[in-house]
Amino acid sequence: MDYGRDPIFPEGFLWGASSAAWQVEGGVAEGGRTPAIIDLNSKTKKPYADNSIAADHYHHWKEDVQLMAECGFTSYRFSLAWPRIIPASDGKVNPEGIQFYNDLIDELLAHNITPIVTLYHYDMPVWVDELGGWRDRRVIELFDHYVRVCFEAFGDRVKYWLSINEQNMQIVYGKWLGLDKGCANWEKDKW
């Protein structure tokens, strides 16, 4: 299954897969992580399933990376869980969250898998949402702080960064994602 040497694809082509922290990690109440808006919605809104365990990547990341290597992956695009890194409004960094992602990144690199990191994939911390979330200008400074922490912690090994996954979904499926507060006519207003 190793397509890395297929002559049809150019040298350096990145073979791999992608995931989102909320879809694969699980461990939503472990390692200092606090709730994200998607955690609350995954328990109550269709089509989401409860993400408390998900694929349990939080506990099986090393095995998961081994499987990626066996499949011939040369890249893995994953997201960081903002509430695992900055769990509270005091802005303090969670060392357990940083260590989890450091270990994952190091393991990927040990298997010659390029980490591609998405900074936000629907998992705004509940504490940010309680301040108004994307509708409040304070989110600019909060997101900036989070991003700078990530660059400082992982930037020596991560070359490829994505800021926000599927920005359009914030509008199109805002209600499902927990972003409909203060927007009674979200269905009409999204267009």
PLM region spans:
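Active-site region of glycoside hydrolase catalytic domains
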Residues: 2-45, 88-89, 98-191
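Residue-level marker of alpha-helix boundaries and capping positions
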Residues: 55, 92-95
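Active-site mouth loops of central-metabolism enzymes
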Residues: 46-60, 134-138
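Glycine-rich, proline-tolerant flexible connector loops at the mouths of alpha/beta enzymes
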Residues: 80-93
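Internal amphipathic alpha-helical repeat/solenoid segments
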Residues: 57-66, 87, 97
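A common structural microfeature
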Residues: 12-14, 58, 75
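Short, conserved clusters of charged catalytic residues that mark active-site
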Residues: 1, 53, 60-63, 145-146
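Catalytic domains of carbohydrate-active enzymes, especially glycoside hydrolases
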Residues: 60-81
